[in-house]
């Protein structure tokens, strides 16, 4: 115990010589008393120890009384003193505390925490709070650890209230609080007495601490004595024994807790975070920082202190080492928490030091900036303030806080890299960062890692010295030898089903090669005239020639002649035509050879009475040798006796006319007269050129077995008969007949050229056989609803073709103008438009009619009738349709009106006369229906009588057909009501009149066409059904009204349709009727085709 007390006494003497006393302000003492509570184990040792300790403190305080003024001058805030790097004396704990807490090496580069908060007028950030706690904890931990090792009483020198200081280099230190003023004088006296007694040299001024630090140290010792030993407080100023003081100084630092310092540090940091915030607003912080604050401000437990009234004896000296180790555990926990807050704990020292350095630097630079603003712009601001009262108010508002806020914004932008002005920016070189693999390989090459050796089968494998190719070959050689390809046995191939595409391609590859057939050439004139005389034709060539036996007889000349003299109604006139029949047959044959080929008009067959058949047989028997002689001889007109005197050609096996008809009667008993060959009918086959390409084979009502070269018509004689009509009873003289035969028997090329040129460009295009054959066999089975839909689509398409410049399209779309005539304009007061039930067009009263549509389903409708191609001309879009051919001359006279922007169909509609618009009914370029032409009864030059034929003028027209139809109907109805004798006469006249009209061609042909026949009305089947219906109605008697009602129900309800749709329905109806006999016609064709080589 004696040696130990001597060591403590020596340490106390040395520390007392180094300590400095200073005055502390009044009012701080009461706050500092509870800051450092010491529970010394020697609290009950006596008053002597306390008195000695107090005397020791006074001596140190008095020694520093003279240096007070000098210290305050050097450091304005009381922190200037010995530097941090000053050497620590061995065993001197007070010197260590002064270096850490009270002394600053460079006060110009140091700012306090209060200065930072006042400069920015803003609280600290969370990162800055973490840095402050870490820097304080690290510094205090070093001081506490070194003080324990030195064994000095460092706890007594710690201040209760201290202030934080930041250096520009990132370091921190602290300054203590001031002492109470009433204790300054007494402590100075005690310090001077102690200095005189010990006579120790004073320390240099450069190493002295500040007045505040000395006062804090003296107050700390005095605080410890008065707080923990208050029952000896009256003995402070009395001298005590030195041995008791040594024992007291030895035991004090072992029992004082560090929690008071840590708690006060937490309060300072939290106050900085809550600086300048409203009272009702709490600072925002993370949960981790909040937990750290709770740990730093936790209350002390009973385990951290020792009760004063318990005498533990010698045991407390045995636990001295353990208490010293446990004193710094709180600091270690705080430092570790701050390190774990970062992603890289190893860089915590550098990071937190950089944060403190930035905070101090920004504050110092702000101060320099504000000082420059004050020095340079003070005069200007004063002058501006004096001149304008508004400026004074603005300057008053613009206080220090605004400048600080501006400075913070500038610093923040600079930290983020904002450019202050534009500069020539040059891109820095691209820095390529290595991949992790490259970094690992570089570290391996630099031998930063020590690789472990890998053992293979208990041994380290040797280095591979062979290349990859050699290793592959070695591996192949080590394997079993391969077999030859010829010795290998492969399994059966897997059966795979070919795809549809592969099957299609395979069928194409294996397809049969078709035999190449040269295109047929036009037969020469000799072969066309004599197809059966050429015995060198091949079988395939003969199949291409369609034989029609009706052309081998010229029975049609009888009806041609009767059409020229249709007004003759007596039997003498009829015999006159029979006598002159051979001469006209010769003329008809010449004209037939000179006319071009034309496709047949697709209307049904005709029913012929037996009288006409007998006349036709007789005529054919007389004309057969004449035709053979005329066609085989050179083309020149010979007298009739010479022609009959020529020897006939060599006899060949052939059928006579009677045998031929007898064969058909036996083979086709079930067919009616309409399905038999035309040589047994009274009417001629019609020739026409229509706009809708129909099927040649299916729409024929006669067997098309006649050679195509003879499918022409007697147009020359017909045009003559139409041009010069003879009065009844007048006959031609032989001279006139001879002149007529010589005139018509001219050069064939001239006649052919003349007849072809008269057809016009549109008609020529439809004489092409290939065009008719390709597009003639397309048929559909449609319903009435589908036809309505097709017509509506075609209406929209035709509407798109209207021009937009003349407002025609707009008026038609808004249903202001008639769709067909484009002339009648509708209004609210009238006239009103009528909507067609089929095409939904709005037409005027002149362009619509009411008709009955009895069927809801139509079979075998030709596609050409409902196709959009009917809207334009078949040849080209710039040529008019055949129904418009009559207006070609008038349209061409309009000049430039038919240019590209106005369709010709539109121009034809606009230029069409009103009477023609009433009678016209076409669908595109399809043939017009004759049903609407019977209302015009005022055509001049036509007279209809009940017993005499009508004489026509040279100008034919549509009204002629209507009048003849009306005359026929009148005659048929009146004949049923007359006596039998008179009825027979009228029936004979009606028969001749009907047969004369049956030879007429369709009225849809142009006027100048060779096949044009002006008195055409409809097909024979339609006339037959009309006549039979008329007779049935008159023969019904009393059941006439009932039959009429039943037929009205069968015929259907009348619906308003436009003229175009009515023509379409009529054409569809007639085409369907013609389709019914097409199968029988095919059978007849197949039966008669093989008779071509034997029939002449």
UniProtKB/Swiss-Prot annotation:
Keyword Transferase set for record: no
A Pfam family it matches: KIND
Name of the featured protein: Protein spire
Keywords, sorted A to Z: Actin-binding, Cell membrane, Coiled coil, Cytoplasm, Cytoplasmic vesicle, Cytoskeleton, Developmental protein, Membrane, Phosphoprotein, Protein transport, Repeat, Transport
GO BP: actin filament network formation; actin filament polymerization; actin nucleation; cleavage furrow formation; establishment of meiotic spindle localization; Golgi vesicle transport; intracellular transport; polar body extrusion after meiotic divisions
KIND domain location: 111-366
Lineage: Eukaryota, Metazoa, Ecdysozoa, Arthropoda, Hexapoda
Comp. bias (Polar residues): 37-51, 921-941
Subunit record text: Interacts with bsk, Rho1, Rac1, Cdc42 and wash. Interacts with capu.
Segments of this protein annotated with the region Spir-box: 780-800
Task performed by this protein: Acts as an actin nucleation factor, remains associated with the slow-growing pointed end of the new filament. Promotes dissociation of capu from the barbed end of actin filaments. Involved in intracellular vesicle transport along actin fibers, providing a novel link between actin cytoskeleton dynamics and intracellular transport. Required for localization of determinants within the developing oocyte to the posterior pole and to the dorsal anterior corner. Links Rho family signaling and Jnk function to the actin cytoskeleton.
Entry similarity comment: Belongs to the spire family.
CDD domains per record: FYVE_SPIR (cd15748), WH2_DmSpire_r3-like (cd22068), WH2_DmSpire_r4 (cd22069), WH2_Spire1_r2-like (cd22078), WH2_Spire_1-2_r1 (cd22065)
Record membrane topology: Peripheral membrane protein
